[in-house]
């Protein structure tokens, strides 16, 4: 059966397309700055920054190779780029989405190992190997969407969708592949990241209580007793603990914001993708078009979300942006080389009784 025409006025479609073009611009510029900062500053090429740059690169590719065609299709309510590119666009969309999710998953596991397990083993070399492996895995998972699948887009005789999507199918193989995509893109990463962040939160809470209790014990000692003790020769001063709790709280809050952003942006799209393949009634209904636009908007919003969060929450990123933006007119600005310094993030979360935490 043929799909119903989308009940969205032309003015609204053009407005949505214009906003999407604005999202493309912001997403491209913000993520490009992230990549260039890491590329041009040797001191910024730590393992975590290499991962963030890869995440930014996948968002750039999503902004350039997928979002413009979606904006045109939303404005014209017609897919004008041919059936061949329709299939290719599906593959590219899932490739860059899977790569971005893979990087988020690697970062989450790395934070878990550092803070909870006290194992800081992710070197820049290992990060590069993980990045290469994630690209290969993402390509292998997304490649089957190019062949043997019924696709749909606005004006192609199937469902009215704002971009090429995996359409309704009775095939068990097609449905199984859709479930695989949903599991790989959302459900497994969500479960792993949720577990990691809950463990991180529990660890930070325990360390906070330890610091609070330790400080209270020493603050309750009578002043006279402290004076008499200090007069004794060879007696060490009471250990002092200085922990930047505001930094710890802010760092974890930043991680939590990224996780919440991932969940909000991808849960609706995952549900819509599953319904489109399993429910013929939903796929060919008039509500599929506006619902698809909303889900796609949220998924594309992720390309804008990450650099905004970096600039808002990370002081070093803001400082690097301030250094870089005035030089952006130069093609190859010379940056003085800096010695590389291995940063141990686990030190931030270690309660030491002999030295202050970094």
Descriptions of predicted regions:
Residues 1-7, 157, 209-252, 315-358:
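Intrinsically disordered regulatory tails of 7TM GPCRs
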Residues 1-6, 74, 78-94, 127-130, ...:
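Loop architecture of class A 7-transmembrane GPCRs
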Residues 9-21, 47-107, 114-124:
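Extracellular TM2-ECL1-early TM3 structural module of rhodopsin-like
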Residues 12-39:
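First transmembrane helix
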Residues 20, 61-77, 90, 97-104, ...:
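Helix-to-loop junction signature of class
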Residues 22-25, 54-57, 61, 68, ...:
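Hydrophobic residues within alpha-helical transmembrane segments
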Residues 103-115, 148-154, 181-216, 254-276, ...:
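Class A (rhodopsin-like) GPCR signature focused on the TM5-ICL3 interface and adjacent 7TM helical core
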Residues 261-264, 270-273, 293-344:
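Seventh transmembrane helix
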